[in-house]
UniProtKB/Swiss-Prot annotation:
Gene Ontology CC annotations of this record: cytoplasm; DASH complex; spindle microtubule
Keyword NAD: no
Key words, A-Z: Cell cycle, Cell division, Centromere, Chromosome, Chromosome partition, Coiled coil, Cytoplasm, Cytoskeleton, Kinetochore, Microtubule, Mitosis, Nucleus
Compartment(s) where it occurs, according to its Swiss-Prot or TrEMBL record: Nucleus; Cytoplasm, Cytoskeleton, Spindle; Chromosome, Centromere, Kinetochore
Family designation: Belongs to the DASH complex SPC34 family.
Gene: SPC34
Protein name: DASH complex subunit SPC34
Signal peptide positions on this chain: none
Amino acid sequence: MSGSLDYCLDQISKSAESISTLYFKPPGIFRNAIVPGNSKVYSDLIVKLIRDGDSIEEMSLYSTDNDGNMKRKDGKVGIYDHLLEREATLKRNRALCLPDPRPITYIPKGFYLSQNDHVIRKKQKPARDFIFEGSNSDELGIYDVLLKKFSKDEQIKQFLHALRNGSVITGEDVSRRKTLFVEDFPISIILSVFREIIDQWPLTEYKEKFEKLMQIYNGLQADINELQKKVEIQELDFQHEALPEKTSISSLIDKEEKEIQKLEKQLDLLEGRNK
C-alpha cells in the first residue's frame, strides 16, 4: 500500500514539475483552492499544481484593504466579493439593531401570465377586421356580450380569448397545456362568431365585409370539394384497374379447366373406340 502511494506521489511530483514549465493565464475573480499541510515536502508541489498560477503574478493583481480582505486592483468583483460584503453588512446591521434586508419575494405565476398578455396586447398591430378594429373594443364591452352569448360553448369562448389576447392556454387542469392562436381554431367557429356580430351590430359595412369573406370561403370550399371528388374518382379507377388482373386470371383458369374437360372427353371417346 505504501509503495503504491509513493508511486502516485512521485507521478504527481513529475507532473507538477512538468506543468510548472508552462505559462498559465493569471487567476480570475474566483479564489483558487489551497491545500494545507506545508510541513510536508510534496505539499508545495500539490498547491502549485492546483492553483495553476504564479504567486508573484497573483500578488500584482490583488491588494488588501484596511480590514484585510483581498480585492483585485483592476476593480473587478465576483460573487465571492458580493457575499463578503453582504455578510459584513448583515453583521453591521444586527449590531446596530437594524432590520435585515427583505428576503426574496415569491410572485405568483398568474401575475407573470397577465403581464405577458398585457405586453402582447400592446405589441399587437391593429389589423383586425369588423368591430375588433382599434383598441376600444374592450371599452365597448363587445367581448363581454359575445362571451355571454356563447357561455356554454367552450371552444368559442377560447377563440374569443385568443382573439382578444393574441393566444389562449388550454388544458390548464391537466399536466400538458397547449397554446392556441386565432388561426388554430376551425373556420366554422370563426364564422359562427362573425354571424353573431352581424346579428348584434347590423351595420352595412360589417355585412359587406362578411359577405366578401363568405364568397371567398364558399369558393375555396367548392374547390376543396371538387378536389376531393377527383381523388375519390381516381381511387375508384385505381381499384377497378386492379380488378381485371384477378378476373383475367380466373377466366384463364376456367378456360384451362374447360380445355382439360374437353380433352378428357376426347380421350374417353378414343378409348371407347379402341375397345
